[in-house]
From Swiss-Prot:
Keywords: ATP-binding, Cytoplasm, Glycolysis, Kinase, Magnesium, Metal-binding, Nucleotide-binding, Transferase. It comes from the Bacteria. GO terms for cellular component: 6-phosphofructokinase complex. This is ATP-dependent 6-phosphofructokinase. One of its GO terms (biological process) is fructose 6-phosphate metabolic process. It is found in: Cytoplasm. It comes from Chloroflexus aggregans (strain MD-66 / DSM 9485). The record marks 117 as: Important for substrate specificity. Belongs to the phosphofructokinase type A (PFKA) family. Mixed-substrate PFK group III subfamily. Homodimer or homotetramer. Pfam families: PFK. One of its GO terms (molecular function) is fructose-6-phosphate binding.
Length: 356
């Protein structure tokens, strides 16, 4: 009698990022080489609660996905999976319903591709017995337990290209250009892009700033004969003693325009603000993100083959390893204010707005 074909599931959850489709492709191709069947679950964890919210994925389904942005499985960062507030098992509990769905589908493993929120949900499912394996995704690069998340490199490329373009127009008109980039709680995109693009000021959540110090930098450049300035600000940056700014309930944003308005008042210069927004999430992944996503997808299937659950694949040095989901969800990977990158930037004269 032939043995039953092994089956694994894969879903994408949270905000989209370049490289999601590359992970899905690697999962399908790696599982296919083992003779396994892959079930693609639509709309993140919400797909575990619906009917007919999944489909079998074959090698034919993932042809041409490497350079393609977005996710063929769709994703959401809203829905039923908030923090579990009780250990009681209820049929109405979405987590209990999800675990039951995983069992009914006969999944040997469920590969969850997402950031900190996604892996936190995966951890709760694992506590209820689900065989989950996480894959780290976020353009913010703020997920703990891994040296790098996929999506970050592409977002960095987009932000750096924007700075390069803003340099020419800023210099032509002697303007101050403020570029707001993503980074809710961490400043990795702003810091890396600011360094790579030659910014004059970098404002990040980890280092509260004073607008007066930023204005001083603009005046200093004017005095040195450089009548334009480039300022990169993460969306979660905040003035000293202040708080994060929101453009709508639950949606960070607005700090770039606030910085621009204050600088016009303090310096009298022509200031223009550019909010990069979702351009950082869309489009084709960079070669590095394609490679990292592929390695993560293949490693997740290998973990399933070895029966390793409740863990997340991660980059450590040059190798892909697995780390406990609890470690990935325990804290955020933040920029250290005295890290080598920050010290390098300061040595180049880049201002973070905190200097006396």
């Amino acid at each position: 009698m032939a043995s039953k074909k092994q089956r694994i599931g894969v879903l994408t959850s949270g905000g989209d990022a370049p490289g999601l489709n590359a992970v899905i492709r690697a999962v399908v191709k790696s599982a296919s080489s083992l003779g396994w069947e892959v079930i693609g679950i639509h709309d993140g964890f919400e797909g575990l609660l619906g009917t007919k919210s999944y489909r079998v994925l074959t090698n034919a389904d993932v042809q041409g996905l490497l350079p393609r942005g977005g996710t063929i499985l769709r994703t959401t960062n809203k829905g039923h999976f908030g923090p579990r507030r009780s250990d009681e098992l209820s049929e109405a509990d979405p987590y209990v319903r999800a675990v039951k769905a995983i069992e009914e589908m006969g999944l040997r493993a469920l590969i969850t591709i997402g950031g900190e929120g996604t892996q936190r949900i995966a951890l709760e499912l694992h506590k209820l017995g689900a065989p989950v394996i996480g894959v780290p995704k976020t353009i913010d690069n703020d997920l703990a337990g891994t040296d790098r998340t996929f999506g970050f490199d592409t977002a960095l490329q987009v932000a750096t290209d924007a700075i390069d373009r803003l340099h020419t127009t800023a210099a032509s008109h002697n303007r101050v250009m403020v570029l707001e980039v993503m980074g809710r709680h961490t400043g990795w995109i702003a810091l890396h892009a600011g360094l790579a693009g030659g910014a004059d000021v970098i404002l990040i959540p980890e280092i509260p700033f004073t607008i007066e110090r930023v204005a001083e930098k603009v005046h200093a450049r004017d005095a040195q004969g450089s009548a334009f300035s480039i300022i990169v600000v993460a969306e979660g940056a905040r003035p000293r003693g202040g708080s994060e700014m929101y453009i709508a309930e639950g949606r960070l944003g607005g700090i770039g325009h606030w910085v621009g308005e204050q600088l016009e008042r303090l310096t009298g210069k022509d200031v223009r603000v550019v909010v990069l927004g979702h351009l950082q999430r869309g489009g084709s992944p960079s070669p590095y993100d394609r490679l990292l996503s592929t390695r993560y997808g293949a490693a997740a299937v290998q973990a399933a083959a070895r029966g390793i659950y409740g863990e997340m694949v991660a980059l450590r040095g040059q190798d892909i390893v697995t780390v406990p989901l609890a470690e990935a969800c325990g804290y955020l990977n933040r920029v250290r204010p005295h890290s080598d990158l920050v010290l390098c930037a300061r040595s180049l004269g880049i201002v973070f707005g905190d200097e006396l």
